[in-house]
Design a protein with these regions (language model features):
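N-terminal amphipathic alpha-helix/helix-capping segment at the start of soluble metabolic enzymes
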Residues: 1-32, 147, 151-153, 289-338
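Hydrophobic faces of well-ordered beta-strands that scaffold small-molecule active sites
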Residues: 27-33, 58-60, 85-91, 108-110, ...
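Catalytic alpha/beta core domains of metabolic enzymes, predominantly
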Residues: 126-140, 170-321, 389-390, 395-410
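Hydrophobic or amphipathic alpha-helical targeting/insertion segments
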Residues: 84-123, 129-149, 154
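Active-site mouth loops of central-metabolism enzymes
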Residues: 23-42, 61, 85-94, 169-182, ...
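Alpha-helix-loop-beta-strand connector modules within alpha/beta enzyme cores
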Residues: 65-89, 137-154, 219-228, 289, ...
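Glycine-rich, proline-tolerant flexible connector loops at the mouths of alpha/beta enzymes
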Residues: 34, 54-78, 112-134, 200-209, ...
Length: 410
C-alpha cells in the first residue's frame, strides 16, 4: 500500500443484478428504506425517491418470512414503473428468512453475530478447542445450505459484521476487540472460499469510527494473508443527523476511502433515506477525484504501523504537540463565521484573522495574523507563507505558524 498516493484497492467483482460491484467498477452508493416492508406501496415510493437521488442499490429490512416474501411484490411494482435497481434484503436472527429472500432479491445481507449463533446475551461461554470446532461445523453446514440457494438464484451475499452484535461465542474467545470482529467475518468468508462462492461483499460497522477503521484495515490484512480480495461495503452505524452525522461519516468512511478501501458505501443518517445519497456522492467524489494526482514522494515514519492507531510523537510548541490535545484553528474571515455568536467551549483555540487588527477580535482565543502585519503582543502569533518566509529569522514570537502546500515544499 502507498501511504502517500491514492490508489484504489483492487478487489474481485461481485455480481449484483445489473450493477456489478468491485474490480474496475465505480464506488457504488446505496441507502436503506425505513418503511414497513409488509407495506408494498410505501416501500416502492421511498425506493423510487432513493433511486432518483442517485442510488445504485436499495436495501430493505426483512424481519420475518412475511416481509421477505413481500419483497417480490415490491420488486414487481418497481419493475412495472420502470425501475430495475437491485434490491438488497437485510436479515437478522433467522437464516430461514435469508433463504426466502435469496430466492427473490439480488443480494442478501446477513449478520454473522446472529445468523447461526443465538442472539447476544453477554454471557461468557467456555469452550474446549474441540467444542469450538463443533460450533464452526454447525455454522458451516447452515451457511452452505444458504449459499446453495444463492448459487441457484444468482444472489450475492454481504457478510455484514456489527461491532455491537458480536455473538457470545466470539466475545468469549476473542473479547470485544477488532480481532474478534474480524474473525467473526472470516469464519464465513472461509466457507465462501471453500465452496467457490465469489459473489460476496464484506462490511464491518461500528458507531465508534476508530474501531471501525482499525477493524476494516485488519480485515484487509487478514484477507491478504489468506489469499482473498473480496469487495468492501463501508458505513458508520448510528451516525446521527445534520452536521454531526455528516462529520462522523466523513471521518469513518472518508478515512478508508482515502486508503483506497471501499467498493460501496452507505452514509447512515437519521433523516429521509434519499438525503443520504448526495452526501455519499460528495464523499466518494472528493476522494476518487484525487486519483492520478501529482505523485507525492513521501517518507514513512519509521515506527508507523498501519494496523495500530498510535499518535505520532512530536515536540511541544506552546500548547501544541506532545501529549496536548489537538488544537482547533478557525478562519475568522469565512463569511459564515459568527465570532460574537460563538460562546463557551465552542470557541476554537486560535482564530486566523489575516491582516486585520487583533484588538478588534475577542481575546477568548489566541489570534493568528499574517506575518507581514504582525506586531508582538500577548496571545497573537504570526503566520508565514512562501512569500513571507524570509521574515522568519527577524520576527520574534514564541510560536510561529507556517502554511505551505505540498508542491511548495518539494
Amino acid at each position: 500500500m502507498d501511504y502517500f498516493n491514492y490508489h484504489r484497492r483492487k478487489s474481485s467483482v461481485t455480481r449484483i443484478g445489473n450493477t456489478p460491484l468491485g474490480g474496475e467498477n465505480p464506488v457504488r452508493i446505496q441507502s436503506m428504506t425505513n418503511t414497513r416492508t409488509q407495506e408494498t406501496l410505501p416501500c416502492v415510493e421511498q425506493s423510487i425517491r432513493i433511486i432518483d437521488a442517485g442510488a445504485d442499490y436499495v436495501r430493505l429490512t426483512a424481519q420475518g418470512t412475511k416481509e421477505a416474501e413481500n419483497l417480490a411484490n415490491i420488486e414487481k411494482e418497481l419493475h412495472k414503473r420502470g425501475y430495475h435497481t437491485p434490491l438488497i434484503a437485510d436479515i437478522h436472527f433467522n437464516p430461514n428468512v435469508a433463504d426466502t429472500a435469496a430466492r427473490i432479491v439480488e443480494k442478501v445481507r446477513i449478520n454473522p453475530g446472529n445468523f447461526v449463533d443465538s442472539a447476544r446475551t453477554f454471557v461468557h461461554l467456555e469452550y474446549t478447542d474441540e467444542e469450538y470446532a463443533e460450533e464452526i461445523k454447525k455454522l458451516r453446514a447452515r451457511f452452505i445450505q444458504f449459499l446453495d440457494i444463492c448459487k441457484e438464484h444468482h444472489t450475492a451475499v454481504r457478510i455484514g459484521v456489527n461491532h455491537g452484535s458480536l455473538s457470545d461465542r466470539i466475545m468469549s474467545r476473542y473479547g470485544d476487540t477488532p480481532a474478534g470482529i474480524v474473525e467473526s467475518c472470516m469464519e464465513f468468508l472461509r466457507v465462501c472460499k471453500e465452496e467457490n462462492f465469489n459473489d460476496v461483499v464484506l462490511s464491518i460497522k461500528a458507531s465508534n469510527t476508530g474501531i471501525m477503521i482499525k477493524s476494516v484495515r485488519l480485515l484487509i490484512a487478514k484477507m491478504e494473508q489468506e489469499g482473498m480480495n473480496y469487495p468492501l461495503h463501508l458505513g458508520v452505524t448510528e451516525a446521527g443527523d445534520g452536521e454531526d452525522g455528516r462529520i462522523k461519516s466523513a471521518v469513518g468512511i472518508g478515512t478508508l476511502l482515502a486508503d483506497g478501501i471501499g467498493d460501496t458505501i452507505r452514509v447512515s443518517l437519521s433523516e429521509a433515506p434519499e438525503a443520504e445519497i448526495p452526501v455519499a456522492r460528495k464523499l466518494v467524489d472528493y476522494i476518487t477525484n484525487r486519483e492520478g494526482h501529482t505523485p507525492i514522494k513521501g517518507k514513512t515514519y519509521p515506527h508507523f504501523d498501519f494496523l495500530r492507531m498510535e499518535r505520532r510523537k512530536s515536540k511541544i510548541i506552546g500548547n501544541i504537540g506532545g501529549n496536548n490535545v489537538p488544537v482547533t484553528i478557525a478562519n475568522a474571515l469565512e463569511k459564515n463565521v459568527d465570532i460574537i455568536g460563538i460562546i463557551g467551549e465552542q470557541y476554537p483555540d486560535y482564530w486566523y484573522i489575516g491582516n486585520n487588527d487583533p484588538n478588534k477580535y475577542p481575546n477568548t482565543a489566541a489570534r493568528i495574523v499574517d506575518a507581514d502585519v504582525y506586531v508582538p503582543q500577548p496571545n497573537v502569533y504570526p503566520l508565514f507563507t512562501t512569500k513571507s518566509a524570509g521574515l522568519i529569522p527577524s520576527i520574534k514570537a514564541k510560536t510561529k505558524f507556517l502554511l505551505f502546500s505540498y508542491p511548495q515544499l518539494d
